[in-house]
Amino acid sequence: MLIRKIEVFLRHTGMPATKFGRLAARDPRLVTDLRNGRTPRVRTERRVEHFMNTFREGPHAY
């Protein structure tokens, strides 16, 4: 599930959920909505996964 991957990412990076949503999907409520049962679209899921993968590879990687 995407939310589990996001939760791990947030714990490792210390990034606030709203900042993550804004950067990953242009939606500051993304993480809160996913925690409350929202099902992301395939495109959103790909965008979020891409964000997490490229963030890990960048100079700010954890």
Which residues fall in each region the model found?
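Short basic helix-loop element that most often maps to the first helix and adjoining turn
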Residues: 4-19
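Short N-terminal micro-motifs specific to bacterial/archaeal maturation
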Residues: 11-12, 21, 36-39
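Residue-level detection of the helix-turn-helix DNA-binding "recognition helix"
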Residues: 25, 36, 53
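Short, basic-rich loop-to-helix N-cap that marks the start of a DNA-contacting helix
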Residues: 32-49
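A short, Lys/Arg-enriched interface patch at domain edges and termini
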Residues: 50-62
